[in-house]
Amino acid sequence: MKLHHLMAAVVLLPVHLSPVQAQSEIETKLCEAARNGQVVELVYDKDKSKGCLPRILDVHQVGLGNNGQHYVHGWQSRGCTKGRDYESKRIFRFDKIKQVEVVDGTFGERSQDAKSKGWDGCIGSNCFIAEILCE
């Protein structure tokens, strides 16, 4: 194979992100959304196989857990949770986020209220966030 054919073959190869690169890309998008008060649409875990629409999340904070996992905390206004679609504060692990995109939208009153109260990194008495990375 001539060198210019080899170069063309290399250029056309698809690029696959490693889990670390994908997590970094997700963190960048979610931190930007948290800092700018933006809404994201995310595909989480097995949502697609369940026939669920992408989740809509007002991003409040991104944190690093005691276990080394990254998490996003915010207000879900649409999405399958335990087989039903409802609004509530939610936490999502980065390693289960399949896709995330910033979308047009504004925080509703309940979401703004939840964000203004802040988050201590706990769910009930289970405090598992070591550090809030951005909000």
Spans of features found by a protein language model:
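Core beta-strand-centered patch of the WYL/Sm-like small regulatory domain
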Residues: 23-135
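Bacterial N-terminal signal peptides that target proteins for export
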Residues: 1-7
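Short secondary-structure boundary segments
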Residues: 6, 21-23
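Hydrophobic h-region of N-terminal signal peptides that target proteins for export
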Residues: 10-18
